[in-house]
């Protein structure tokens, strides 16, 4: 099931310049998801990171992993319109390859555990089949107040 940017924006609240998933390529509800982010030099982080050698910040790769997981949660639950998804913990984040403008990040997340409103994930970012980043993280789903 392909999910385009319009539906992604219906599923998660992020917007430019902080929307870091362009398309979902595969989704297996309650299990895993694969999406992409096309990295372009026009993104605001590259004006300062770094002006003469643009490099995608590691924290934004982690954020992209969290966003793809939030899309998986929203689709698995049927909707998160009346809920907020909060990142609770990031574990073992590792960065293994530079990501730069022109690259396409393939962002994969797997649900490791889900208990009531707490979800645990393993996630990776690859570029051209090469591991760029990996992390485990925990998120909480709460009713909007």
From Swiss-Prot:
Main subcellular localisation: cytoplasm
SUPFAM superfamilies associated with the record: Thioesterase/thiol ester dehydrase-isomerase (SSF54637)
Keywords: Cytoplasm, Lipid A biosynthesis, Lipid biosynthesis, Lipid metabolism, Lyase
EC id: 4.2.1.59
Pfam hit, one: FabA
UniProt-listed InterPro entries: FabA_FabZ (IPR013114), FabZ (IPR010084), HotDog_dom_sf (IPR029069)
Gene Ontology CC terms, in alphabetical order: cytoplasm; membrane
Record localization: Cytoplasm
One Gene Ontology MF term: (3R)-hydroxyacyl-[acyl-carrier-protein] dehydratase activity
Gene Ontology terms describing biological process: fatty acid biosynthetic process; lipid A biosynthetic process
Active site, per annotation: 49
Catalytic activity entry: a (3R)-hydroxyacyl-[ACP] = a (2E)-enoyl-[ACP] + H2O
Organism superkingdom: Bacteria
Top class in the EC scheme: lyase
Family listed: Belongs to the thioester dehydratase family. FabZ subfamily.
HAMAP family, sorted: FabZ (MF_00406)
Protein task: Involved in unsaturated fatty acids biosynthesis. Catalyzes the dehydration of short chain beta-hydroxyacyl-ACPs and long chain saturated and unsaturated beta-hydroxyacyl-ACPs.
Record's protein name: 3-hydroxyacyl-[acyl-carrier-protein] dehydratase FabZ
Species this protein is from: Rickettsia akari (strain Hartford)
Lineage: Bacteria, Pseudomonadati, Pseudomonadota, Alphaproteobacteria, Rickettsiales
